[in-house]
Amino acid sequence: MPETIENQACIVIAIAGASASGKSLIASTIYKELKEELDSNDIDIISEDAYYKDQTHLTMDEREQTNYDHPDSMVHYLLVEHLRQLKQGKPIQIPEYDYAKHNRKTSSKHFEPKKIIILEGILLLTHETIRNEINVSIFVDAPLDICFIRRLQRDLIERGRSMDSVISQCRKTVRPMFLKFIEPSKQYADIIIPKGGKNRIAIDILKAQIKQLLSKK
């Protein structure tokens, strides 16, 4: 379990769920609204995607065969180390990821500790040591067919993917890994948000919970 909130430099809110379930939308909505309501810059977002393994040693064809929905595709020990450093009030260097090249960039992002850290990613609740660093865990629940449509649109427009590659990946790894790892991790969530990223009531409840936690610091 996380240490007492009063002794932490930051509060960690984790938002997990299927790929394209609405995690990023909820994270960005909470970020923007709390930043305005609290009149504070002391809130930021970390994406689990930044912690995909470096694949410089692989060819592009080999990278395209990587199972990016399996926990082994991530360097989770580094994410845990970074969360602990942030909670101690120390800055970190977050890796940066290139979706088109399926690999880390050579650059990294300097990240200062904030009072509120919103962590979003598909596999966050599958890893016990990450769960132990989380103060509030959320699982965004959305129908898989809706997630597939959103992912197809997103990857074609934002990530430079081909339609065939997205469809193949969803069939071979995304759906099977969701059923094997991600959906079972829902049991570890403090809050389950149905209807994806546009659930206004759930967002307001989550914001109220974060404000309550802040009042204890």
From Swiss-Prot:
What lineage does UniProt assign to this protein's organism? Bacteria, Pseudomonadati, Pseudomonadota, Gammaproteobacteria, Pasteurellales
Query: Where is ATP bound in this sequence?
Result: 17-24
Under which EC number(s) is this enzyme classified?
Answer: 2.7.1.48
Q: Which UniProt keywords apply?
A: ATP-binding, Cytoplasm, Kinase, Nucleotide-binding, Transferase
Name the family: Belongs to the uridine kinase family.
Q: What is this protein called?
A: Uridine kinase
Identify the Pfam families for this entry.
PRK (PF00485)
- Annotated localization: Cytoplasm
